[in-house]
Swiss-Prot record:
CDD domains: KAZAL_FS (cd00104)
Predominant localisation class: secreted
Disulfide bonds: C6-C36, C14-C33, C22-C54
SUPFAM superfamilies, per database record: Kazal-type serine protease inhibitors
Domain of life of the source: Eukaryota
Protein name: Ovomucoid
Species: Cygnus atratus
Amino acid sequence: VATVDCSDYPKPACTMEYMPLCGSDNKTYGNKCNFCNAVVDSNGTLTLSHFGKC
């Protein structure tokens, strides 16, 4: 199972770097920061499906 450490999130701003991750909601997140902010917003219900685009 792929995991991402989101312990240092949420962050107020994310960089524009593109390193896509696919969430358990079948949505592609542009990078770890965007994904981790969404994980925090979801109260931990969002998980990583896999690295790369969905």
